[in-house]
Amino acid sequence: MTEIFSFTETGPDSLAATWGPLRTHRLTWQPGCDLPALLDEWEARLTGLDDPDTAALVTVPSHEVAAAPSLVRHGFAPLTVIAERRAGTPVPPRPAEVRLRPATRADLDVAVELNLHTVRYDSAFGMVTERANTAEHLRTALADVLDRDHEAMWLALHGDTPVGMLYVDMPEHAGWMERFASARPFAYLAHLGVRPDARGTGAGSVLTAHAHDVLDRAGVASTLLHHALPNPCSTPFWYSHGYRPRWTVWVRRPALRSSPGVSALLERPNET
């Protein structure tokens, strides 16, 4: 039986510490659950008063809009979306001036730099946290991707200069997303990032279109990704490329606050 309330701690010396807080309380949503009552019960179990490295997370299907009022009243915000693209979804045309090539081991420094740009931009939106060792752990993880026996990472180029990077986890590396996939086999689009001075040039679209072509030809039925919902770049971008929201991660960080915050107040604003 699935545990409704859970708590996990992430070691600070790990890449996982970049993707969220070190201490995470989770409430597992289930169909038909009494979410308002569960949220009330959960409040008494939470720890980490005013600790920014704690968070309370509830992941609900994006179409479950009835869950939103209770979550808002408890001070939660929708920060992350798990989105999905089904195979064969049409994509926008590729800009001709952007070239693309597979990344190699010789590109590891560039790949780390481009991934760090994404980490730093996404850190504004409540979940991602750059740590002192983030670059070191990204280097290890990206080296593993480059060592796979198939192409999984590509660079977008302006002239000969890399300005963007995308990599995917093919089905054999995407099993950890099993519960979120609506079709099989499924892959996970793990990273897309473009250098700040090259955003809006089409580099991201070229990389995405190429990755989708590779995945479709490989027979991948579903591609999943995470994106920051408040990010003004990623949200419109992914939906213009055929993705649709499937699950929304509602977050309160810190998990406990000495002040409840504006979103937790029930009073209506003064309309006079």
What are these regions (language model features)?
Residues M1-W42, V163-P185:
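Conserved donor-binding loop and adjoining core beta-sheet/short helix segment
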Residues W29-E97, W247-A255:
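Acyl-donor-binding surface of acyltransferase catalytic domains
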Residues G32-G48, H191-V194, G200-D213, R217, ...:
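Conserved acetyl-CoA-binding loop-helix of GNAT-fold acetyltransferases
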Residues S62-P78, S205, R217-A218, A228-W247:
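Conserved active-site alpha-helix within GNAT-family acetyltransferase domains
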Residues A56-T59, L189, T223-H227:
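Conserved hydrophobic beta-strand within the GNAT/NAT acetyltransferase core sheet
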Residues R99-L114:
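A short beta-loop-alpha structural element at the N-terminal edge
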Residues M1, T140-L155, G164, P171, ...:
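A short helix-loop-beta-strand connector motif used in the catalytic cores of GNAT acetyltransferases and
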Residues D122-A141:
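Conserved GNAT-fold acetyl-CoA-binding loop/helix
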